């Protein structure tokens, strides 16, 4: 069994995926800034509801950001702890790539303060690395890559369809100590 965790945006997205890469069950909730209070409880509920013991989870799939600083941190700490304690495989993908269709497109996420996170991909290859830029600069980049579809702020995105679409493109982490969330900006002080 695989456990998918995404806490990078305004939603807590969790899923159990079987060995045939089919979603067994999923959970999604708008968090209202209470991410740290609900994620562990919701994972426990999802596992219990499906009669899955923690030891049956053989891999964790995690979105690493960018997005909410706290959200990125919460999912990251849970995934890293689980991978270390239960000695399971860890797979990661950034939330900008995850938002694209088949790993191709201009991916944008609002970073607040008149800035946006942006990255550009073609067939899962980075053409423009994940960055945080002023809105004006983002518009200029969009014009340069106008042949690609634009995906913004997870509008009309079904997280669980995306999970199955991208599952084989998550990157396995060999050494969890070398992984960090993809923040791209400093936390608000």
Where are these regions (language model features)?
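Nucleotide and nucleotide-moiety/phosphate-recognizing core
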Residues: 12-13, 17-128
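Oxyanion-binding and handling regions
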Residues: 1-20, 37, 91-189
